[in-house]
Amino acid sequence: MDIIDNVDITLPENGEDIVIVGGRRYDYNGDLAKFKAFKVAKHIWVVPGRYYGEKLDIQDGEKINGGIYDKDFLSQNQEKQEFMDGVILLLKRINNTLEGKRLLSLITSAVPFPNEDDGIYKQNNFILSDKTFKAYTSNIIIFGPGANLVENKVIAFNSGDAENGLGTISEICFQPLLTYKFGDYFQDPALDLLKCLIKSLYYLYGIKVPEDFTLPYRLTNNPDKTEYSQVNMEDLLISGGDDLNAAGQRPYWLWNNYFIDAKDKFDKYKEIYENQMKLDPNLEINLSNHLEQKFNINISELWSLNISNFARTFNLKSPRSFYKALKYYYRKKYYKIHYNEIFGTNYNIYGFIDGQVNASLKETDLNIINKPQQIINLIDNNNILLIKSYIYDDELNKIDYNFYNNYEIPYNYGNSFKIPNITGILLPSVNYELIDKIPKIAEIKPYIKDSTPLPDSEKTPIPKELNVGIPLPIHYLDSQIYKGDEDKDFILSPDFLKVVSTKDKSLVYSFLPNIVSYFDGYDKTKISTDKKYYLWIREVLNNYSIDITRTENIIGIFGVDEIVPWMGRALNILNTENTFETELRKNGLKALLSKDLNVIFPKTKVDPIPTDNPPLTIEKIDEKLSDIYIKNKFFLIKNYYITIQQWWICCYSQFLNLSYMCREAIINQQNLIEKIILNQLSYLARETSINIETLYILSVTTEKTIEDLREISQKSMNNICNFFERASVSIFHTDIYNKFIDHMKYIVDDANTKIINYINSNSNITQEEKNYLINKYMLTEEDFNFFNFDKLINLFNSKIQLTIKNEKPEYNLLLSINQNESNENITDISGNNVKISYSNNINILDGRNEQAIYLDNDSQYVDFKSKNFENGVTNNFTISFWMRTLEKVDTNSTLLTSKLNENSAGWQLDLRRNGLVWSMKDHNKNEINIYLNDFLDISWHYIVVSVNRLTNILTVYIDGELSVNRNIEEIYNLYSDVGTIKLQASGSKVRIESFSILNRDIQRDEVSNRYINYIDNVNLRNIYGERLEYNKEYEVSNYVYPRNLLYKVNDIYLAIERGSNSSNRFKLILININEDKKFVQQKDIVIIKDVTQNKYLGISEDSNKIKLVDRNNALELILDNHLLNPNYTTFSTKQEEYLRLSNIDGIYNWVIKDVSRLNDIYSWTLI
């Protein structure tokens, strides 16, 4: 779609694409609105000013929590210009993808249905010039925000037409200059605009979702009464994500007629257009062409448009939960976006210039309204205020009754429709190229229709204030926040009451015992050197890791095998003199809930079966009962998923709330630790004589440690989510599902009674036939036993990311090595986008399992560069790879290094004396060298080096076995700002395969499993671990005599070689008889050819010896590998007879065929 660029908002009206508009709707003063509009694309207009329908100078009582109000916003031309630039850039960004092009083109063609008036077709989608009264086609108008600067919304010009299928113009209130954060990333404003555009499409098509089509969402946190949030179906559809997926899993709430009615309206007007209007010569051709494209789609394609799908299309991060509900968990801060050079651009057509996570945006200085739902005062026995805390709620509407109280599940409805779950290309029916070629509708004939009055602003409720004597979780959370001066130190205390009772702001609550103990008596003046700092920061991180990631096994609670013991101390949950585990066992998981479960089984009624008149044959009765049986089973499933919905609302949402509280607790503790660390670093910079260069190393190393701190926090959060997910499903099983089963028995009895009565009422079938039908169509308990623990866990995934950092990919580097006809290709597939460079003469050859890098001279290298390789004091890592040296290693040569030069800090792996040397050197010149001698034997070996900087343990594994377990506490800071790892050979001939670097350490079991997974595959191998190939020459030895090769006796029989200089060695090639392939695999059927003679392996029937025969008598053999040694192969016939060595017969051990028990003498290796 063509989008006009570089629009100057100071240009005067020109009667084409700049128009002074007025006369269609009244503003907040009751006057006809007037504004200056700019056409930026076909049928799309932008107004660089505030929305006319809302009063900008509003009273405090009308301001909503989290809103920003400034009547002067967009009053200056410079600000208006940036608004215009921002909207145009966002439209161009959307238009820069295939799905975005389709969406914008569809918006331009989706003109509201015209009104026929005495043979003239008139449109209601227009703006009107205030001077000439000329009408201009407009499907959407994008304004600046209304009173609330951060409230994006879409207003239908006529709300009736927005729902009745005719369609109406949309007015969008939009804020492109401010954004906010979810977790560690900024919300891309393109997604916010897309949300408005999708809603506009609903209005243009006339399929707006009714306001009363709502679903209960969750229990609120109102301590006074039981209250539910409810979500409008339109918002849920457009947001997408986990909530829509969960609601759409089994959408048996769809007895609301919206989806069916919307499709009927679409089909109605489509039929009118195609059968009447399209044939009328009075219909303007461009209007007709746009209508044709409007109706060319499947209406369900509109319901697949949601923010989650577009985020996937744009490769953007986006919340998986409903936006408005998230406001309960995230107190938004807003940040400025700049689209032009004047303020310093930080956003372009590809999104944030530095990415969603690393974007450099300044926080706005505009005041954000703070209106909590409740103020909870914790008071002591003397009514003295200890701490004041605020409870906020989501932006959803509330109901104070149970949605399911008067609810009846329909028996005959909601059985077929399902919300489309599109994961491929969106809007596949839209031909944007064709639409864009259709000229704009120029000669518009306006149809004047009254607009829907704009709603008045509502008064926001005054926060309720409540005094409590028992601390709530919110009080515990607030006590963990340091509220003193930024440059002051503070003390961590495990005593909550002491913290809230004192007026000393330097006292902060911590529930982490090891951390509190470690900092007890902490004196930053004693940490005065870099070495002491390194030791100290490592211990801080280690204690934090022990405390925050700690879990305990628990037995006896269904579905829950681990608990997180600190959550009781963090939130005052189940806190008595007993431990968290003891209280949990004593009171059960339900004790974690603040509101009682209130699951109501809706009214259910199985419809009676109509009596047949005249009576049916047994075949017809069977057919009828089959339909009823399916309907009955479906009715049971509907009851099950309605029960699940209630469980989500009443139970799961409470656990989700606790999860977010635990998230806040983790973040609070993390922030405290970070502040202590940074204060200590600041002290070293101010008060000690440490030189500038060392201070720089200390600073960047600290950044790496803080990254580790945040990763540890995320691991703790994952433990929390896992516990609450399993706890919620456990409650469903133990407290809800059994009641559901009892309820189902009542329904089943009712349904079965109706089936029996119906069958017995048929007098034209025999009793035997009646019994047959009763047994066939009676429902049993198996028909409603739906519970599946794992499926229920997967249905609702509550994994929560912390606000600071998302989890990194597991691998810092995961190498992919490929070779095609034109070049070699070495890439990183870890997700970290590691920069890789390598010499032009690098070789890629077949490796053990995959393709391998082959290094055979000093000029060859592969460099890996990433900030993840800038190891510091606390960064754990694991290096693993397969390697094969192709010759004896006599001299020292470097294979792998993170060091810039010999004197640099870092680690290094050298080849030496047919072995390896692992070395580490820190910035304080401390160094270790670990020797692994004499194991390289030109075979493939699996090498793993794992470093845990918190436990100070280095482990090295060779072929899955532990070879080194070494304490490395004398090694401090390994930081290198080069961030480069070099792979080289320095004179040795080496193949490297499956090279990877993990961002953590690994233990013996994981190493062993990885090794087994590598070797346990279908490929057969030679003595060195290389894959066997067809049509390649090999010599053969036996497992029992590995040094003795097979040779030919009289050029007829095969036996073990006697003497090392035999001139008649047996050399073979393997030939696959069924298919043409390169590598030999398990269960392949082959014949074996003698290389020196045109002969093949056969059998001498008289002696059972293997002999050389012609092609027609060649023995077909099945190949397999040795169970314990993958480099050895077995040869067997289809009769399960194996080739083996005979017992010594004179001077020979013959190769024979035998059926006795398989053992080592049946195993052969090819060389």
UniProtKB/Swiss-Prot annotation:
The keyword Membrane does not apply. Residues 1-381 are annotated as: Light chain nLC. Expression of the ptox operon (ntnh-orfX1-orfX2-orfX3-pmp1) in B.thuringiensis kills Anopheles but not Aedes mosquito 3rd instar larvae. The ntnh-pmp1 construct is about half as toxic. InterPro entries: Bot/tetX_LC, Clostridium_toxin_transloc, ConA-like_dom_sf, Nontoxic_nonhemagglutn_C, Toxin_rcpt-bd_N. Belongs to the botulism non-toxic nonhemagglutinin family. P.bifermentans strain Cbm (subsp. malaysia) is toxic to Anopheles mosquito 3rd instar larvae and less toxic to Aedes aegypti larvae. The presence of 4 plasmids, including this one, is required to kill mosquito larvae. Residues 382-804 are annotated as: N-heavy chain nHN. This is Non-toxic nonhemagglutinin. Induction: Part of a high-molecular weight complex with other proteins from the ptox and cry loci. Encoded in the ptox locus, possibly in an ntnh-orfX1-orfX2-orfX3-pmp1 operon. Keywords: Plasmid, Virulence. NCBIfam families: botu_NTNH. One of its GO terms (molecular function) is zinc ion binding. One of its GO terms (cellular component) is extracellular region. GO terms for biological process: proteolysis. SUPFAM superfamilies: Clostridium neurotoxins, 'coiled-coil' domain, Concanavalin A-like lectins/glucanases, Metalloproteases ('zincins'), catalytic domain. The lineage of its organism: Bacteria, Bacillati, Bacillota, Clostridia, Peptostreptococcales. Transmembrane segments: none annotated. Has 3 domains that are structurally very similar to those in PMP1; light chain (nLC, equivalent to the light chain), N-heavy chain (nHN) and C-heavy chain (nHC).
